[in-house]
Amino acid sequence: MSISWTRNFFERFCVEEYNIDTIKQSSFLSADLLPSLGARINQSTKLRKHIISPFNPRYRAWEMWLVLLVIYSAWICPFQFAFITYKKDAIFIIDNIVNGFFAIDIILTFFVAYLDSHSYLLVDSPKKIAIRYLSTWFAFDVCSTAPFQPLSLLFNYNGSELGFRILSMLRLWRLRRVSSLFARLEKDIRFNYFWIRCTKLISVTLFAIHCAGCFNYLIADRYPNPRKTWIGAVYPNFKEASLWNRYVTALYWSITTLTTTGYGDFHAENPREMLFDIFFMMFNLGLTAYLIGNMTNLVVHWTSRTRTFRDSVRAASEFASRNQLPHDIQDQMLSHICLKFKTEGLKQQETLNNLPKAIRSSIANYLFFPIVHNIYLFQGVSRNFLFQLVSDIDAEYFPPKEDIILQNEAPTDLYILVSGAVDFTVYVDGHDQFQGKAVIGETFGEVGVLYYRPQPFTVRTTELSQILRISRTSLMSAMHAHADDGRVIMNNLFMKLRGQQSIAIDDSNTSGHENRDFKSMGWEEWRDSRKDGYGLDVTNPTSDTALMDAIHKEDTEMVKKILKEQKIERAKVERSSSETAGRSYANDSSKKDPYCSSSNQIIKPCKREEKRVTIHMMSESKNGKLILLPSSIEELLRLASEKFGGCNFTKITNADNAEIDDLDVIWDGDHLYFSSN
């Protein structure tokens, strides 16, 4: 089991998210390759023969192996520089094996494609790869891999030549690989950013302590008078001590100096050590500022959500106390803030808003379509209607005992209960009366939204609930764009309301609180009543209150009386307009009743668009006459007969000689030709 876990752990480092053969990405954050503008997204990137992709998993594994060798080199270089003389031992063999791996990497680099910094495309030309490598890091890589230890033994048998030791320190150049690794891991969302940064900061601190201790010991070891050194003053025969004791003592001095503790047991004794301590303390100032700044930033970022939450709770509590709000409202405020804090990572509405509309629609369709599809209100509607509707759905969480809808509130949204439960209550005589309950999969608020009536109930959650919210604007737009689906929705609502005995509605236009039977007026009446004109506009809460009340009470006589008065006013307006225009047909058309009755005892306006047409006699090539199109074919034939001297016309054709027998096919501005059979 441990072997499998270890393999999976290293695969997270080695496997790159970018698949070069299929251009398939699971995460684009750590991949630097971008397609050029206009490039086909499904076009595979094929490199030349013997050229290796830098995103190849095997090459990533090779880089990870080199990083482990770099960690070894970072520790052994300062340690050998200060404590160990070069000789043919186990460390000598290991160092040369490590150098061999880095020599192989130098050769391998000539066959690895690189990412162009200007075009962000992979360059696989061997010539360009070689020129780029030779002009950048090749010389440093060679110097950091050169076998200076064997050369030191060749020219200096005791292996203590300082020059070769300094040259061996060039192996620290390999640390750039560790820096690149941390830079890549910080952008990789598969790893925790906080712990990656902490690991990097701890590694920098340990390396600084290790190097400072080794360098300070080297100064004491090379000083002519061992007793006048920082370690010789305490241990006069320190050179005879074990390697472990000397190394631990050096680290002790380094870390006490780095942390500015300074116990005083080890301190500089000669000018060389004093000079080194001066530069080391100056370095410590910058390193300490770097560590404190980064750790502070990480901790602040980690605790910012909690701090914001506490500030919000404190502000809400102070606001409630200052304004002496009731305890139930205070509890709702605090519950809402607490729930928002807990579900902040679940909703992520800000993330969705930053995505393109097509992606948001796909996400909404995947999450909400199965839920909306099973709602009674949308049974029988088309898939296109639901797809348009779910794109504008918002999911929200509500804590227990929070009001979602208030009684007599203006209708704004339709709600679908996904989880939890809500109660319906009506405020009567100073008390809330329980009217019903909604469970998972049910809707509420549809009556107020579809009829633009004040909300009949107060809807309050009884437990933690997830609710989908559909705005009235989105629903109305979808219903008008899909008229057949709108008719189905209104019929579904009508069937539900007809099956209920009574629905309590508090009418704000009348006094008292009564329970009334609320019936649907039907889709056709609802749709026509929304048109501009002199009819009832149910979308305007301030329009014709008496007529709305009459329809709501199903008082047919009152509806007829009110509409009769409106018809008289309408006729006066049309007659005045006709006389001013001087139209010959205006007097005839003003006699027509602009209102017609519907099949459900609800009278609605029959609004007719006026069209101007030019009429001609087929047998004469005289100028035509411009008239207003009447309401029937017979009226049009009669009017043409009057205009052309009493001719008995029986046939109407258009400019293309096509016979016309229906006024609906005539457009404004058409030329009509009359003839007799």
Curated annotation (Swiss-Prot):
It comes from the Eukaryota. A nucleoside 3',5'-cyclic phosphate binds at residues 377-496. Residues 568-577 have a biased composition (Basic and acidic residues). Residues 568-601 are annotated as: Disordered. It is a multi-pass membrane protein. Residues 1-63, 112-134, 187-200, 294-677 are cytoplasmic. Residues 249-268 dip into the membrane without crossing it. Keywords: Ion channel, Ion transport, Membrane, Potassium, Potassium channel, Potassium transport, Transmembrane, Transmembrane helix, Transport, Voltage-gated channel. Changing R176 to S/L: Affects the voltage-dependent gating. Changing T256S: Increases calcium sensitivity; facilitated entry of calcium ions. Changing T256 to F/L/P/R/W: Abolishes channel activity. The segment S4 is probably the voltage-sensor and is characterized by a series of positively charged amino acids. The pore-forming region H5 is enclosed by the transmembrane segments S5 and S6 in the Shaker-type (1P/6TM) and contains the GYGD signature motif which seems to be involved in potassium selectivity. The KHA domain (rich in hydrophobic and acidic residues) present in the C-terminal part is likely to be important for tetramerization. Belongs to the potassium channel family. Plant (TC 1.A.1.4) subfamily. The potassium channel is probably composed of a homo- or heterotetrameric complex of pore-forming subunits. May interact with AKT2 and KAT2. Interacts with SLAC1 and SLAH3. This is Potassium channel KAT1. It comes from Arabidopsis thaliana.
